[in-house]
Regions:
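Long, contiguous juxta-domain segments that are non-catalytic but functionally important
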Residues: 2-26
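C-terminal scaffold of the Radical SAM
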Residues: 17-34, 52-85, 91-285
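Local cysteine-cluster metal-coordination motifs and their immediate loop/turn environment
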Residues: 38-53
Length: 285
């Protein structure tokens, strides 16, 4: 049986861009041009995840992760053609972000090739920020070095928590001690670093969250994101909550954890610049 298709907006029937994409910015300035590339593959699907991603089991026989870059290349050319039809001027991308899923399920050469295709189709601005998300357990030092040599500039690692029982609830399979190791490797390769954290997991205490914040600050990435857990209907975690196996996160608890994060990160020299993001000066993305 083929996997169910993700729910979302229907594909455009005409091949044209939505009107809001082609519209000028409200202030009359030129809109910055960025490219997001999605890699919809994971080794294990986390119980809270409602993103468009598939495991090898979900893809079924005959499916190939390696074929994805070829398909993505076609999609980028279609996007460029739609922009041309809309009369949008060709502008090099100022930022490229590869998300997922787990982009580092691909071999490094495929990620580098994806960025190269963006350069061929749209161009890359001088000093463009090129980021990929990464699971700490899917990379080693050689992998990160290959990314840096291939033109990527930044890696965002999915740390989520420094507390083992919280990682277990979130279905994360890496060990907490893996995160500082991969950040060191990334720095040696010349890559900027970011860490993603999640707060509000069932069973996570305020002390657990404090430990995660302290661990993240000690690692000292250039950038940090902290997201409140949202349990979406249809996910495995939603079913666990419905069955009474896990408690639903409480709004007051998540609000207190957000305030704790802001205070801890501000005290460590990180500047809040967007709802869920803090950065060292100059490291905003």
């Amino acid at each position: 049986m083929s996997p169910a298709q993700p729910v979302g907006d229907p594909l455009p029937g005409t091949g044209e861009l939505p009107p809001q994409v082609a519209a000028p910015a409200p202030d009359g300035n030129e809109r910055p041009f960025s490219v997001y590339l999605h890699v919809p593959y994971c080794r294990v699907r986390c119980g809270y995840c409602d993103f468009n991603t598939y495991t090898n089991l979900a893809m079924g026989p005959g499916a190939s992760v390696g074929d994805y870059v070829d398909t993505l290349e076609c999609e980028l050319h279609l996007a460029r053609a739609a922009m041309d039809r809309a009369g949008l001027p060709a502008r090099p991308a100022q930022t490229v972000f590869v998300g997922g899923g787990t982009p580092t399920m691909l071999v490094p050469g495929d990620l580098v090739r994806m960025v190269g295709i963006v350069g061929e189709v749209f161009g890359l601005a001088d000093g463009a920020e090129v980021t990929t998300e990464a699971n700490p357990e899917t990379v080693d030092e050689a992998y990160l070095t290959a990314l840096a040599q291939g033109g990527l500039t930044r890696v965002s690692f999915g740390m989520q928590s420094a507390v083992p029982h919280v990682l277990k609830v979130l279905d994360r399979t890496h060990r907490p001690e893996r995160v500082p190791l991969v950040v060191r490797w990334a720095r040696r390769a010349g890559l900027a670093t970011s860490l993603d954290l999640i707060y509000g997991a069932p069973g996570e205490s305020m002390e657990d969250w404090r430990r995660s914040l302290e661990a993240a600050v000690e690692i000292g990435p250039d950038h940090l994101s902290a997201y409140a857990l949202v349990i979406e209907e249809g996910t495995r975690m939603w079913a666990q909550v419905r069955r009474g196996e896990l408690p639903m996160p409480e709004d007051d608890d998540e609000a207190a954890k957000y305030e704790m994060a802001d205070a801890a990160l501000a005290g460590a020299g990180y500047r809040w610049y967007e709802i869920s993001n803090w950065a060292r000066p100059g490291a905003e993305c």
